[in-house]
Amino acid sequence: MFKDITLGQYYQTDSLLHRLDPRVKIVGTLVYIISLFVVDTFAGYFVCLLFLAAMICLSNVPVGYIVRGMRAILILLLITMSFNLFLTPGEVLVRIGFLKITREGLIFSLKMAIRLSLLVIGSSLMTLTTTPNQLTDAIESLLNPLKRFRVPVHEIAMMMSIALRFIPILMEETDKIMKAQIARGADFESKNLIKKMKSLVPLLVPLFISAFRRANDLAMAMEARCYRGGVGRTKMKPLIYEGRDQAAYMLLVAYFAICVLLRFLRLPFLI
Amino acid sequence: MIKISRLIHDYIQRDEEGNPSGTIRALDDISLDVEPGQFIAILGHNGSGKSTLAKHLNALLFPTEGAVWVNGLDTRDQNLIWDIRQTAGMVFQNPDNQIIGQVVEEDVGFGPENMGVPTQEIWNRVEESLKAVGMYEYRKKSPNRLSGGQKQRVSIAGVIAMHPRCIVMDEPTAMLDPSGRADVINAAMTLNREEGITIILITHYMEEAIRADRIFVMDEGKVAMQGTPREIFSRVEEMQALHLDVPQVTLLAHTLRQRGLSIPEGILTREELAEALLGGN
């Protein structure tokens, strides 16, 4: 049931991108996503694609593995494409019954598809090359200025990392409860949606109870190990920028500058 | 190391609206002393108050009456809580609910991080603690991939990394298979013998208790019996009256003795029984 979830999966290998400071990767992903919305021509998307391809090369993650992750959004992609294809007004190219495909619609839906695919691949590249722990560390460090406005940054990061730690444990537990219910005649296979929803209740109640019990135990175990919030805490793996991280930031600035230029130069041969 | 004087702990019962409706006396007038470096076992059936007692040693619960001193520190003093928790580490029953890190080494580093130990020193402590429990080669693994016994040894390493004087283990082997159980107890024994760390082991496996220096048997919130393993396990009927078993060998020897064989009481191991039987001939 939960085998298909590939969200935030980490691909273990050694590469330049894996070793990069996670803060650079988060900032880089944000810059990359913004750049996808800055450029609006096919040439612009080509630049983004080149950048992405270079990053994939640096990541040592097999291209097939990344593309396979795209299957999850295939339906979403097809729906957005068809809506844009058929519903954009403009110069009619083909007419099938009451449906019409316009020139503008065709271009727009193509751009949309490219943009969406690049966006998903780009952001999944970040999670593929960064462990969840590094991600939470980086988020804590990047959000640090917000502490001045009394945002509990450390607590948020700690919550995220504990949540990630408990995902596999709770999944295992769900599986166990499900098997126990099936052994007593529960029906989880029903195709009927309402029946399916109803069968989830006896699954969720014990799951929630056990999750609360675990939370209680964990809180006590953390207190027993002197946890008292972020104040006065040291780090086992502090984040320190190195030469390659600075180089990466420079590269990002250059990349973004190119994207902005492409948008505002409005060269006549670009569509 | 630990001194408990006339300790009483009441749990407050609440009705459905959350109003206090009565109290349950979980610990009733307990006094005991633990010398530094001892290996102590606490036995007792479910609900005898042994977990409640354990939580007092770590300032997770506070006395209703009486007092607990850990290495001379009074647990009633709120300012000393963190020193006490550092002095007396705690290992709980369920390994999954006490491992915080997603990588073994990060979990072991959690305690020292909380104490504000400098980064380089944390790495030293993590290395030495993982080596002490024989889990060093698993340091980069995810805790989810380890067996129960391995997870529990990681939990122990997480406590050792805080350099405690005493480790309280609250049924650390209850959820483990026999080989995991042996690994955990051996790790605890090694720490006790080689590092001189005081160990307080709460268990209901009698085989684990026979290696202790001293045993406390709890019943209904009171210390019902105390003494060396040999003293405790030679009182077979008393133990059975408290719904506790004695080791199988001890029981066998006891039954043989009742049937008229001349062997001593309080036999704890198979070797001792064999020797006694051969000596009798």
Report residues per predicted region:
Chain A
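Juxtamembrane/interface alpha-helical elements of multi-pass membrane proteins
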Residues: 73-186
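Transmembrane alpha-helix interface motif
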Residues: 1-42, 48-57, 144, 148-151, ...
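Alpha-helical transmembrane segments and their membrane-interface exit regions
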Residues: 51-61, 76-79
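Loop-to-transmembrane-helix entry motif
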Residues: 69-73, 77, 113, 117, ...
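Alpha-helical transmembrane segments and their helix-start/interface "positive-inside/aromatic belt" motifs
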Residues: 25, 64-74, 248
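Transmembrane helix-loop junctions in multipass membrane proteins, especially transporters and channels
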Residues: 41, 45, 60-64, 88-96, ...
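Membrane-helix interfacial "entry" motifs
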Residues: 14, 37, 60-65, 96, ...
